């Protein structure tokens, strides 16, 4: 874990992409797995408890139908019998015959009997009674007389005659002269109750309204109910409740039989729902692992396809920023990264051409500066010779003619030197102007590159906006698929309920059961298809998110390219400024050379005047001396300017040496 954290602390685009993609891959799957597990647990709970409730309700209906028919018979006898029916032996025999006939044709009826308010008792079939038996002292008689003509159903009890579980249904005679009652065996009902399955290990039980067991898997009949859940169950006529019994969580569904007041309940262990849901969890984990493996391979491929060109682009940009203009960027993709690589290559080619032209111009300027310096030196020496000749001429008239000729010869040499200086200065000026134009062209190339980089940036932002739109639409489709999936689940549940109802209907519902099964299969297929589509949409959303991260990183790299291009632009602006400054110096030097040429002509005219007018030699010599001194000062200025020009050319050469073009 510590190694992974240290790995994350080192920032890189590949790490960011890998972490982002893995998070986008795992988080939705975990959320979907958690929600699927919760949903499956809830649906299994609803399905199992729904089946249990249906079984309990069905058994409750069976109890009502079975005992209801017997209660109607008791009501019939209570309305047809009167006080006179118990008087006289013939009347009593007639009653017994009716009772016997009903017992013989109705299974589950143990006996029918009646008692009058005078103590008379009639029963069928005939059984031996205790001596002094008085029906008026029996609970069934007393409860019925207190009920005011309503049906009375006793709690179940074990019959002393045959050990069967029976209940008694009793009702007061219509004229109030006695009570008629019927003992009914409920062993068959109890056997049906034992067949009720609630989950795998759950069971059903019956309790009386007096909170005693009628039938239970682990308790005897008549045993009192105990536990916190008892009060909750008797608080409502029907419902569901959760409770803990013997440190085990259980869930119960129950209802109340209207005729008997019994509580009919089905209970199961909560662990069954958890065990049934484990298969969903296991399947989800398998899907998660498979998705991580497949997604990881795809993520590595995508990350490498993005970061590999970016690394080459960054490395080449650093090489170019260090002055190596021979570097080329090889990106063969046709996307924005490929276009950016082509733009960098075009910029490098433009820079190489520009630097090469500048170096040629600088070499020409340096050579011309050296020639100018040499010519200025020669001219300075000639001027010194003229000055010395004038001084010698002023010392004696005898040497005047020779000095004048020597001065005339030196002036001719000086004129030739000045013409050479003028031509060299003109060449340097042209080279400087050409360098300025080339620097301006380079600056335009850089500005065009900046414009193209900005265009790429706008294209990336527009593509990012389009991808975001696709992401929103994909999420809308996912929402619709979830609705379809919910409808399919509901259809599946309805089909299961229909199959249960068809199973209860027996042979008459077999066709409906087949149709329900087909509907359930279609619902399952629809749900599976919806899940597959939802999975595909989620993969599309993940790829869209990947594209968005790619656009952001490309946008950042484009911004870095803009910074590098701006730095290059500033360098060319500096070169352009220096070439302009050199052009200004050259123009100043041209003006100085022109002035020097004019002065040289004046000196030549003065020397000619010396040859023609000897009398004015003294004044002419002074003029020549003054002109010679001015000429010497001008030559020193030219020499200084040439030196400065040579230094500036050397500095410009040093600047261009930073760039490698071959």
Curated annotation (Swiss-Prot):
Modification Glutamate methyl ester (Gln) occurs at: 371, 595
Sequence positions bearing Glutamate methyl ester (Glu): 630, 637
Post-translational modification remark: Some glutamine residues are deamidated to glutamate by CheD and subsequently methylated.
UniProt effect for mutating residue 371 to D: Marked diminution of methanol upon both addition and removal of asparagine. No release of methanol upon asparagine addition but methanol release upon asparagine removal is not affected
Cytoplasmic side: 1-16, 304-662
Residues passing through the membrane, by range: 17-37, 283-303
Membrane topology note: Multi-pass membrane protein
Pfam families: dCache_1 (PF02743), HAMP (PF00672), MCPsignal (PF00015)
GO CC terms of this entry: membrane raft; plasma membrane
Domain HAMP: 304-356
Keywords, in A-Z order: Cell membrane, Chemotaxis, Membrane, Methylation, Transducer, Transmembrane, Transmembrane helix
Remarks, miscellaneous: Only chemotaxis towards asparagine is completely deficient in the absence of McpB.
Oligomeric form and interacting partners: Interacts with FloT.
Family membership noted in the UniProt record: Belongs to the methyl-accepting chemotaxis (MCP) protein family.
Protein name: Methyl-accepting chemotaxis protein McpB
Source organism per UniProt: Bacillus subtilis (strain 168)
């Amino acid at each position: 874990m510590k190694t992974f954290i240290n790995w994350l602390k080192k920032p890189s685009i590949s790490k960011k992409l890998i972490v982002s993609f893995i998070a986008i891959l795992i988080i939705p799957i975990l959320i979907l797995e958690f929600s699927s597990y919760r949903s499956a647990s809830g649906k299994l709970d609803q399905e199992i408890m729904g089946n249990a409730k249906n079984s309990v309700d069905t058994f409750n209906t069976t109890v009502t139908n079975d005992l209801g028919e017997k209660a109607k018979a008791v009501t019939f006898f209570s309305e047809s019998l009167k006080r006179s029916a118990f008087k006289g032996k013939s009347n009593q025999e007639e009653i017994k015959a009716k009772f016997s006939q009903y017992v013989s044709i109705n299974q589950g009826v143990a006996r029918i009997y009646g008692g009058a308010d005078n103590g008379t008792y009639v029963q069928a079939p005939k059984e031996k009674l205790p001596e002094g038996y008085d029906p008026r002292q029996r609970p069934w008689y007393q409860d019925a007389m207190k009920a005011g003509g309503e049906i009375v159903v006793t709690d179940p009890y074990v019959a002393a005659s045959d050990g069967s579980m029976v209940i008694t249904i009793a009702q007061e005679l219509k004229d109030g002269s006695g009570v008629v009652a019927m003992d009914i065996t409920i062993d068959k009902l109890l056997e049906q109750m034992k067949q009720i399955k609630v989950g795998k290990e759950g069971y059903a039980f019956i309790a009386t309204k007096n909170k005693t067991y009628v039938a239970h898997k682990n308790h005897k009949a008549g045993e009192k109910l105990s536990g916190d859940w008892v009060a909750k169950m008797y608080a409502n006529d029907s419902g569901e409740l959760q409770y803990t019994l013997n440190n085990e969580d259980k869930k119960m569904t129950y209802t109340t039989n209207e005729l008997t007041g019994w509580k009919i309940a089905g209970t199961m262990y909560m662990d069954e729902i958890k065990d049934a849901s484990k298969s969903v969890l296991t399947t989800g984990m398998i899907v998660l692992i498979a998705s991580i493996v497949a997604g990881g391979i795809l993520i590595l491929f995508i990350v490498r396809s993005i970061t590999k060109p970016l690394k080459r682009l960054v490395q080449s940009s650093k090489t170019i920023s260090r002055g190596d203009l021979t570097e080329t960027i090889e990106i063969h993709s046709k996307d924005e990264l490929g276009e950016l690589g082509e733009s960098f290559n075009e910029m490098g080619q433009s820079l190489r051409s520009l630097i090469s032209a500048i170096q040629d111009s600088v070499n020409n300027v340096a050579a011309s500066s050296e020639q100018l310096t040499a010519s200025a030196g020669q001219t300075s020496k000639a001027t010194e010779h003229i000055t010395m000749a004038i001084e010698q001429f002023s010392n004696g008239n005898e040497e005047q003619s020779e000095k004048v000729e020597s001065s005339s010869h030196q002036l001719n040499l000086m004129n030739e030197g000045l013409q050479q200086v003028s031509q060299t200065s003109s060449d340097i000026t042209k080279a400087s102007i050409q360098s300025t134009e080339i620097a301006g062209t380079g600056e335009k190339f850089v500005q065009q590159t900046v414009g193209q980089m900005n265009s790429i940036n706008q294209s990336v932002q527009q593509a990012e906006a389009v991808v975001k739109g696709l992401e929103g639409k994909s999420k809308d489709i996912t929402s619709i698929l979830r609705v379809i999936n919910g409808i399919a689940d509901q259809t599946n549940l309805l089909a299961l309920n229909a199959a249960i109802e068809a199973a209860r209907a027996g042979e008459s519902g077999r066709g409906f059961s087949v149709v329900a099964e087909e509907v359930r299969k279609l619902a399952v297929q629809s749900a599976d298809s919806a899940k597959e589509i939802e999975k595909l949409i989620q993969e599309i959303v993940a790829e869209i998110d990947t594209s968005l991260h790619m656009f952001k990183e490309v946008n950042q790299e484009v911004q870095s390219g803009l910074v590098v291009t701006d730095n290059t632009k500033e360098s060319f602006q500096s070169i352009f400024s220096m070439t302009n400054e050199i052009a200004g110096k050259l123009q100043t030097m041209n003006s100085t050379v022109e002035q020097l040429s004019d002065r040289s002509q004046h000196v030549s005219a003065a020397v000619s005047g010396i040859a023609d007018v000897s009398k004015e030699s003294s004044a002419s010599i002074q003029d020549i001396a003054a002109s010679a001194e001015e000429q010497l000062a001008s030559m020193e200025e030219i020499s200084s300017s040439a030196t400065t020009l040579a230094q500036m050319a050397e500095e410009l050469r040093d600047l261009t040496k930073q760039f490698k073009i071959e």
